[in-house]
Structure formats: C-alpha cells, structure tokens
Swiss-Prot record:
One of its GO terms (cellular component) is cytoplasm. Homodimer. Catalyzes the NAD(P)-dependent oxidation of 4-(phosphooxy)-L-threonine (HTP) into 2-amino-3-oxo-4-(phosphooxy)butyric acid which spontaneously decarboxylates to form 3-amino-2-oxopropyl phosphate (AHAP). Its main location: cytoplasm. One of its GO terms (molecular function) is zinc ion binding. This is 4-hydroxythreonine-4-phosphate dehydrogenase. It comes from Burkholderia vietnamiensis (strain G4 / LMG 22486) (Burkholderia cepacia (strain R1808)). GO terms for biological process: pyridoxal phosphate biosynthetic process; pyridoxine biosynthetic process. The gene is pdxA. Binds 1 divalent metal cation per subunit. Can use ions such as Zn(2+), Mg(2+) or Co(2+). Its EC number is 1.1.1.262.
Length: 328
C-alpha cells in the first residue's frame, strides 16, 4: 500500500514582500524534489499569479500536480515594495489558517514566508513575531527558535532567549528555563531530525564565559547548574564555552546544535555561513513549522533578484521533519 502523501501548508506572508514570488519559484520542481508531498499554498491567487509573471516563474505549477492554492483574498491591492496596513489582518489570516489546519491534522507541517511585523501591528493587532504567535496559538508554554544550514552536517544554532533587549537577557536566563530548552532541543532533534544521540554545545553569556566569575556569574550560577541537571536527564549538553571561540570547525565537528544565550550571539555566525540557504525551525510546538531565514526584502519584491534558496531549504526541511515524525 502506498503511504498517503505528506501535506505541507505554505503561508505566503507579506504581500508587498518577496514571499509570494519565492513560494512559486521554490515549487517549480516540487514533483521531482519531494515526490511524497503535496503542497497547499495559502494566499491571494491573483497576487501569486501576477508575482510569478513578474519574476518569470512558471505559473502552471500552481494549477495542479503536487501544488494547490487555497485562495485568501487581499484586503487591499498589493504593490511590490509598498506596505499597506490594510493587509495586516490578511497576513495573519493566512497564518491562522495554516495553524488551524496543522492542529486539526490536515497538514503535516507548515512553512512560513516572511511577514512584516509592523504591518500587523499597524492593523491594530499586537504582534511580536511568528515564533511567539505560534506558541500562543498552540498553547505551548516554551518554544525554541533554531536556525540551521543545509547539507550532511549542518550548523544548527538554537536560542535560549529570542526577541529581548540585551539588558533583559540575564534576568531571563534561569536554571529551569535552560533545562527545559535543552530538553526540547534534545527531543526534537531525535524525533524530527532522526538523530540518535544529539550533542549540544552551550555558550556562556559573558565574554570568555565569565572568566571564572570575574566577568559575570551567570555561567557559574545558572548555566553550569542547568547543564548538570540536563546531564542527569540523559541529555548530552556541554559547556559553557566562550562564544567567540566556540564557532570553530574543531569544536563544531562533533556538535549537532549550539545553544546560544541571546539572538545576536549565535545568529550572526550562522547567517554569515548559510545566508541564502539557511532556515528557521520552531522547536517545541505540537506542529512542525519551518521558515526562511530572511525578511520581506521589500526592495527586491517583484524584481526577480531575490534568491529562493532559503525557501527551498525550508520546504525540504519541513518534508524531512514530517517524514521522521510520521515514522516515529
């Protein structure tokens, strides 16, 4: 008996940005790349058609085969590169439809194109970001943002804190919180990435990982105790290591993931190494969610100059994760 196709939902994000065109471009070879998957594109059908034409992509990919379009009408006409708060709720409606479908079991994974946070806020809806919204909608108390490269041994970087001002990071780090974060990373790398024994390297917070307390005590008072407790739970998490030396091949060779303490500690290295083909994964959710690792790129929208590599990688990772989860 042939297994049922994996069902992947794609939200096309901010209509003035590159999301609609990158979605169509990334799906050009979908039947060959992902023969066991079906893709549902959530967005305005006319917008997708127009943006595909603008960048020279084959619009026929949206008309059958492994790809279908779930039409959601724009609230106002969309023009490449020009934001309109009238479409803020449209963007959120796409995300809600994908989340609802995944929670109901209709989708095995969702892939999100970039959105503009300001547009949603300007529409009167308080919105911090995809990650926080997904956690709220799925009633998940703790999620973990992880960005990753591609290839046989990809660099993966997870974050202990996400969109926080730097002055608030230290207070946000707790022993229990770090243990929970490490447990989520360990579980999801096993279940959704097929890793039998994940190894996680953990950065310190302070320069030189605190220099034995002379440059800060978070490593001694919070991070090291969290690592000890995680070890008692069978989690292979090592550190804390100075972040300025950890990201070297000789350290990363045996690592499956790096846990950084804050956003701009871990992500610049990863984006430098992978930009254009990196992806974002939200760990800890009851559903699978991946996305591109870049923003709306308003200046590139409709020009054909935006690179679909990250969207292809996000789709590929979503399919891979869905295969593992279905088999688990």
């Amino acid at each position: 008996m042939t297994a049922a196709a994996l069902q992947i939902a794609i939200t096309t994000g901010e209509p003035a940005g590159v999301g609609p065109e990158l979605t169509v471009q990334a799906l050009q070879d979908a039947a060959r790349r992902w023969p066991d998957a079906q893709f549902t594109v959530l967005g305005d059908a006319a917008l997708l058609d127009a943006r595909a034409a603008a960048v020279g992509a084959d619009r026929a990919v949206l008309a059958g085969g492994p790809v279908s379009v779930q039409h959601h009408p724009l609230a106002a006409p969309a023009h490449a590169g020009t934001l309109d708060a009238a479409n803020g709720r449209y963007v959120l409606a796409l995300l809600d439809a994908a989340i609802d479908g995944a929670l109901a079991g209709r989708y095995d994974a969702i892939v999100t194109a970039p959105l503009q946070k300001s547009t949603i806020n300007d529409a009167g809806v308080p919105f911090t970001g995809h990650t926080e919204y997904l956690a709220e909608r799925t009633h998940t108390p703790r999620v973990v943002m992880m960005l990753a490269g591609t290839g046989e041994r990809p660099l993966r970087v997870a974050l202990a804190t996400t969109h926080l001002p730097l002055k608030d990071v230290s207070a946000a780090l707790t022993i229990d919180g770090l243990v929970d974060t490490l447990a989520i990373i360990d579980r999801d790398l096993r279940r959704d990435f097929g890793l039998a024994a994940p190894r996680i390297l953990v950065t310190g917070l302070n320069p030189h990982a605190g220099e034995n307390g002379y440059l800060g005590r978070e490593e001694i008072d919070v991070i090291a105790p969290a690592l000890a407790r995680a070890s008692e739970r069978g989690i292979d998490a090592r550190g804390p290591y100075p972040a300025d030396t950890l990201f070297q091949p000789r350290y990363l060779a045996g690592a499956d993931c790096v846990l950084a303490m804050f956003h701009d500690q871990g992500l610049p290295v990863l984006k430098y190494a992978t930009f254009g083909e990196g992806i974002n994964v939200t760990l800890g959710l009851p559903i699978i969610r991946t996305s591109v690792d870049h923003g709306t790129a308003l200046d590139l929208a409709g020009t054909g100059r935006a690179d679909p590599g990250s969207m292809v990688a996000a789709l590929d990772t979503a399919v891979t994760m869905a295969r593992h989860r279905r088999a688990s």
